[in-house]
Amino acid sequence: MATYKVTLVNAAEGLNTTIDVADDTYILDAAEEQGIDLPYSCRAGACSTCAGKVVSGTVDQSDQSFLDDDQIAAGFVLTCVAYPTSDVTIETHKEEDLY
């Protein structure tokens, strides 16, 4: 099992934190375990409440069903169903930017 450094950033929220996340753990779940309060609703990859944007690195979010190909290509990620596949930096609280 690999573990990656996941950096969660959001200037408006005063968030700039790096956590260790195993490659079989959803980023949202790992953040919660570390006491980081990120937005979420369905926890199933079927809405956009937890949306973030990948700044660098890669994730596996094959369990998601909400984002379209263009949104994924633009770097959007649903943190509730995203596993890290490398060290990754994600801007959080990006739901409004999807629309």
UniProtKB/Swiss-Prot annotation:
InterPro entries noted in UniProt: 2Fe-2S_ferredoxin-like_sf, 2Fe-2S_ferredoxin-type, 2Fe2S_fd_BS, Beta-grasp_dom_sf, Fd_pln
Superkingdom assignment: Bacteria
Cofactor annotation: [2Fe-2S] cluster
Domain 2Fe-2S ferredoxin-type: 4-96
SUPFAM superfamilies assigned: 2Fe-2S ferredoxin-like
GO MF annotation: an example: electron transfer activity
GO biological process, one term: electron transport chain
Cysteines engaged in disulfide bonds, as pairs: none
UniProt keyword Metal-binding, yes or no: yes
Cofactor stoichiometry and binding remark: Binds 1 [2Fe-2S] cluster.
Pfam families: Fer2 (PF00111)
Alphabetically ordered keywords of this record: 2Fe-2S, Electron transport, Iron, Iron-sulfur, Metal-binding, Transport
UniProt: [2Fe-2S] cluster binding residues: 42, 47, 50, 80
Function per UniProt: Ferredoxins are iron-sulfur proteins that transfer electrons in a wide variety of metabolic reactions.
Entry similarity comment: Belongs to the 2Fe2S plant-type ferredoxin family.
Known partners and oligomeric status: Forms a complex with heterodimeric ferredoxin-thioredoxin reductase (FTR) and thioredoxin.
Record protein name field: Ferredoxin-1
Lineage: Bacteria, Bacillati, Cyanobacteriota, Cyanophyceae, Synechococcales
Gene that produces this protein: petF
